[in-house]
């Protein structure tokens, strides 16, 4: 969910604009985006020539995203919004008009043509040559590269097979806890029928994105006063909750966090696209994972550390970053945000999701591939 295109949009949208110069500085940065997009074209073209490609599934998604940007009305283009919505207390009417006209010209004459060039290459040349498989083992030296990635992201010497087996063990553990919840709610049916109930019953879903967003706001403010029960130190940086922008929501994950910077809070972004597919029982676990005491605490406190090298304040090691997120989900037990058994099942659902990923991801690059599919089929 964190591709370069979305990062470009986020770096504009999440910046604090506190002076006239801030807007003109960002217009100057926007002028560099054409080169950035052209570099993506060159890198992907080289990768294709050397046999390094993305799966077809990924390529199709990127092509669709690029089409949505290229075909959007100029006034709704994500790069225009910051200038259209600029604070009129910081700009004169003429200055705002100058910014809008300059950005519009830049988008029409440079940025969109660069996106069109990248789009056409991906659609006409790259897609047909993209991998049918999703396993990175199918690129040159892919198996060895995957083994390196396993060491890098886990900070251990665990092999993919060992990680695979850990995932299988976790699936068994989590499944037994799920079965206990099913007994607690006196469900008259098997495991599969219970899952179907959770996925289809209107009681677990909001009718619209506004109600879903308000539920996230309420949950975050419910958690805030409970945190002194489990923490003594708090980050100085505040946090907020925002919806994931509509232009990227269909293509990205359920939620994510964007760290604070001087003058700007950290933000927990919630996906409101198709609220009928986003269950209420996921709201508590997502909030403690992405916001507090999850990534906001972990990242903000690290940034505020004193007497440590700067790189240590910003270095993100996946085993720790996501490990903290899972730890925060467990802390939800201590502040009773899973007092409803369905909310607890929601937390276990995310636990199960991670365990399944361990099995499936490692299974795509080793002889355990068939075993991974058998496991998921059983579930």
For each feature predicted by the language model, list its residue ranges:
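Active-site-proximal, well-structured secondary-structure segments within enzyme catalytic domains
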Residues: 109, 113-267
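Long, amphipathic alpha-helical stalk/connector segments used for oligomerization, subunit docking
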Residues: 334-371
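Catalytic Zn2+-binding segment of zinc metalloproteases
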Residues: 292-305
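Conserved functional hotspot residues or short segments at active or partner-binding sites
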Residues: 15-156, 160, 165
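Single conserved hydrophobic/aromatic residue that forms the stacking wall/gate
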Residues: 2-8, 12, 369-372, 376-379
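Post-HExxH zinc-binding segment in Zn-dependent metallohydrolases
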Residues: 299-300, 311-340, 358
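Short pre-active-site segment immediately N-terminal to the catalytic Zn-binding motif
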Residues: 272-286
């Amino acid at each position: 969910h964190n591709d370069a295109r979305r990062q470009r949009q986020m770096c504009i949208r999440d910046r604090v604009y506190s002076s006239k110069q801030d807007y003109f500085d960002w217009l100057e940065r926007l002028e560099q985006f054409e080169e950035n997009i052209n570099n993506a074209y060159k890198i992907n073209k080289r990768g294709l020539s050397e046999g390094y490609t993305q799966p077809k599934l990924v390529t199709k998604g990127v092509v669709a995203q690029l089409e949505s940007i290229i075909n959007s009305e100029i006034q709704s283009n994500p790069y225009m919004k910051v200038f259209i919505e600029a604070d009129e207390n910081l700009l004169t009417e003429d200055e705002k008009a100058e910014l809008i006209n300059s950005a519009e010209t830049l988008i029409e004459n440079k940025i969109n043509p660069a996106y069109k060039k990248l789009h056409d290459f991906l659609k006409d040349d790259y897609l047909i040559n993209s991998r049918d498989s999703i396993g990175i083992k199918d690129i040159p030296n892919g198996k060895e590269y995957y083994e390196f990635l396993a060491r890098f992201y886990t900070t251990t010497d665990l092999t993919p097979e060992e990680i695979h087996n850990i995932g299988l063990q976790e699936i068994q553990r989590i499944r037994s806890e799920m079965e206990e919840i099913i007994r607690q709610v006196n469900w008259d049916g098997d495991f599969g029928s219970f899952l179907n109930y959770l996925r289809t019953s209107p009681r677990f879903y909001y009718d619209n994105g506004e109600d879903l967003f308000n539920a996230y706001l309420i949950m975050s403010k419910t958690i805030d006063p409970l945190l002194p029960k489990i923490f003594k130190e708090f980050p100085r940086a505040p946090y907020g909750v925002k919806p994931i922008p509509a232009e990227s929501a269909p293509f990205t994950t359920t939620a994510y966090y964007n760290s604070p910077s001087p003058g700007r809070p950290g933000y927990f972004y919630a996906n409101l696209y198709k609220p009928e597919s986003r269950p209420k029982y996921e709201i508590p676990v997502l909030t403690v994972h992405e916001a507090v005491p999850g990534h906001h605490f972990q990242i903000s406190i690290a940034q505020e550390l004193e007497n440590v090298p700067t790189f240590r304040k910003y270095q993100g090691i996946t085993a720790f970053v996501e490990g903290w997120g899972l730890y925060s989900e467990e802390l939800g037990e201590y502040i009773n945000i899973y007092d409803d058994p369905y909310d607890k099942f929601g937390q276990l659902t995310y636990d199960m999701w991670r365990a399944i990923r361990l099995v499936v991801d490692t299974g795509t690059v080793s002889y355990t591939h068939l075993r991974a599919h058998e496991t998921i089929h059983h579930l």
